[in-house]
């Protein structure tokens, strides 16, 4: 699956966290998303994939070639999105080859994304942009990270001649409310370095 397709699929799923909830994860919507990620990871061929009782998802990509003795590496990303703005329903789309002008996000509500308001947009002229209809968050933080990590893992699995050390993946709930590592099981992340 291409990273763009994966990202659009992920942002369409509501995983907004709730800082007022005493539960962990703070919202029940994060668990089905975690289960879906675990199924994808198993289907692509990652080993030791598990969604634990607190909603964390772990998976492993064994070392290849002469890299078996290399130190382990881990990649982490969080599944929840910010509770600070509406997060559903996300109506994401791609603006192809952005022309540098205003982007009409929502014709009914006359919502625009304008370089006059956000001058940084000018840096992205000619590139493809992911946007919403302006009524919700996109969810790029951190579903873009999940999409990138899983797409890279899938690529390495499909190209086993590329040498790499052992890689662990971990996806966490509730980072946006400051509880992302409250129940993480570090024994499942045998890595010298994590990003």
Language-model region placement:
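Acidic/His- and Gly-rich active-site-bordering loop/insert found
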Residues: 1-129
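Acidic/histidine-rich catalytic neighborhood of metal-dependent amide-processing enzymes
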Residues: 122-195
């Amino acid at each position: 699956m291409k990273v763009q397709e994966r990202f659009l699929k992920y942002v369409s799923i509501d995983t907004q966290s709730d800082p007022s909830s005493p539960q962990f994860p703070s919202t029940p919507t994060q668990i089905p998303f975690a289960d879906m990620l675990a199924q994808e990871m198993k289907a692509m061929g990652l080993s030791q994939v598990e969604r634990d009782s607190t909603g964390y998802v772990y998976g492993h990509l064994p070392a290849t070639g002469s890299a078996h003795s290399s130190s382990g590496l881990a990649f982490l990303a969080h599944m929840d999105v910010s509770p600070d703005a509406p997060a559903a329903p996300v109506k994401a789309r791609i603006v192809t080859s952005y022309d540098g002008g205003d982007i009409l996000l929502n014709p009914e509500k006359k919502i625009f994304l304008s370089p006059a308001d956000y001058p940084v947009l000018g840096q992205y002229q000619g590139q493809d942009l992911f946007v919403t209809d302006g009524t919700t968050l996109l969810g790029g933080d951190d579903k873009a990270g999940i999409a990138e990590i899983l797409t890279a893992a899938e690529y390495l699995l499909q190209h086993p001649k590329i040498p790499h050390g052992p890689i662990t993946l971990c996806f966490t709930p509730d980072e946006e409310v400051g509880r992302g590592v409250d129940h993480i099981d570090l024994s499942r992340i045998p890595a010298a370095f994590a990003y």
